[in-house]
Swiss-Prot record:
UniProt keyword terms in alphabetical order: Ribonucleoprotein, Ribosomal protein, RNA-binding, rRNA-binding
Annotated organism of origin: Sulfurimonas denitrificans (strain ATCC 33889 / DSM 1251)
Family listed: Belongs to the universal ribosomal protein uS17 family.
Record text on subunit structure and interactions: Part of the 30S ribosomal subunit.
Chain's role: One of the primary rRNA binding proteins, it binds specifically to the 5'-end of 16S ribosomal RNA.
Gene Ontology biological-process entries: translation
CDD domains: Ribosomal_uS17
Cellular component GO terms held in the UniProt record: cytosolic small ribosomal subunit
Name of this chain's protein: Small ribosomal subunit protein uS17
The keyword Nucleotide-binding is assigned to this record: no
Record GO terms (molecular function): rRNA binding; structural constituent of ribosome
Length: 82
């Protein structure tokens, strides 16, 4: 069994049925100015039970491609919105 990549991010949009868009933040050192800057990337996550809401913090795990741009599925909700 292979080790699947996990990403942690915040839900920013519910993109249709069983799909949520999350934004993942990473911090990198700027090559010239040596300052830590934030970089963001959006991923589509498969939500089988339609349980996610905008603002939730989640952990997603890599899986086989479910569509052209969707290759992650929901693993757990870390912090839910009330």
């Amino acid at each position: 069994m292979t080790h699947k990549r996990e990403i942690q991010g915040n839900v920013v949009k519910i993109s249709g049925d069983k799909t949520a868009s999350i934004v993942v933040e990473r911090r990198v050192m700027h090559p010239r100015y040596h300052k830590v800057v934030k970089r963001f990337k959006k991923y589509l996550v498969h939500d089988e039970r339609n349980e996610l809401k905008v603002g939730d913090e989640i952990v997603a795990i890599e899986c086989r491609p479910l569509s052209k741009t969707k290759s992650y599925r929901l693993k757990s909700v870390v912090v839910g919105v009330k």
